[in-house]
Amino acid sequence: MIDILNYTFFQNALWAILLISITSAIIGTYIVARRMLFITGGITHASFGGLGVGYYLGINPTLSALVFAILSALGVEWLSRGKSVREDSAIAVVWALGMAIGIIFIFMTPGYTPGLTEFLFGNILTITRTDIFIFAAFAALLIFYTVLQYKTIVYTAFDADFAHTRGIKTRLVNYIMTFFVATAVVLTIRLVGIMLLISILSLPQMIAELFCHKFRNIVWLSGAINLLCGIGGLSLSYWLDVPA
């Protein structure tokens, strides 16, 4: 196991696990507290539409997926808050529309679509130094905003109505956090895949809630769980010679 640490791709994977653990701990705790876990699946599948458009137009699929994810997430937030549309209904529309657009454009793309399997099932060993720097910049921005607006985020997540009566701009907080959720989904999806992403953003928080009740403690414990499971899974993939 020590020998594999000398390889750059394995070092990159370890850095990726650390960054994923940090971002998913904050994002996951927020969406679980708001009881909006379903939106993660909606954004994930909406970004699939962006992938299809990106492959069809010959542009960076990650960039097009990011645009789709952010617009879809903000659209869900706007529809559910500003209009008489239930949040779960808006998410279902985004979910179905994103998948439909993705399938159509991928089918229309001539030739083979390289890298599509990575987005569906993930491959953390393919992350590059550039990806790590981008992810690290996003994680730093997320941590900075969370520390700066910690109480505001907690009040909004657990009781938005009470927070509104206290003069907190809950809609602005929701929009900003929704932006972070969408960006985190797109940055993580190529590393762990659509299938595993929802689990990373929910299961550690559910386990942490069994032992903690404060938002801050749930973030720390869920991050530690993600980190240990990620390193453990990567180690097992090496020992058993199976996909990471």
What are these regions (language model features)?
Residues L18, I22-I26, V67-G75, I101, ...:
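Generic alpha-helical transmembrane segments of integral inner-membrane proteins
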Residues T128-L203:
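Helix-loop-helix "hairpin" substructures at the membrane interface of multi-pass membrane proteins
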Residues I106-T113, A182-T188, I231-V242:
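Hydrophobic alpha-helical transmembrane segments in multi-pass integral membrane proteins
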Residues Y7-N12, K83, I91-K151:
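Transmembrane helix-bundle core of multi-pass membrane transporters
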Residues L191, M195-V242:
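Transmembrane alpha-helical segments in multi-pass inner-membrane proteins
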Residues M1-I22:
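Membrane-interfacial amphipathic/re-entrant helices at transmembrane-helix boundaries
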Residues L14-L19, T62-V67, A92-V93, I132-A137, ...:
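Hydrophobic alpha-helical transmembrane segments
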Residues T29-Y112, A208-W220, S237-L240:
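Short loop segments and helix-boundary regions at transmembrane helix junctions
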